[in-house]
Amino acid sequence: GKFQRAKPDAYRLMKTLRRGDLLFWEHTYRPVRKPPITHVMVYLGRDPQGRMWMAGSQGSRGVGIYEFRPKMKMGSYPWFLWFRREGKFIGYARP
């Protein structure tokens, strides 16, 4: 499928995402490629309360099911002086 760059707008994503979509983050660790996509999860859908869920791995916790909150930062690495570059959600694709 085609990659769709997306802002971390939960309301808009709730209307757009479908089960099985791939969710992409950049800069969850120091990238060695362009574009700097460093993490992928699979969108599972919404529960009756409207929360969005995804499956994949997060660090050393292994594979699991996690709440998808698009504005939540994921991972980081030292960047410049005392600054850290934080991983952020950047888009999705339909396989």
Q: Residues of each region from the PLM?
A:
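Short non-domain terminal segments
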Residues: 1, 22, 66, 78-81, ...
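...with weaker cross-activation on analogous glycine-rich loops/strands in unrelated enzymes
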Residues: 1-64
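A short, polar/proline- and glycine-enriched secondary-structure boundary/capping micro-motif
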Residues: 63-71
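Low-complexity, Gly/Ser/Thr/Pro-rich intrinsically disordered linker/tail segments
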Residues: 71-95
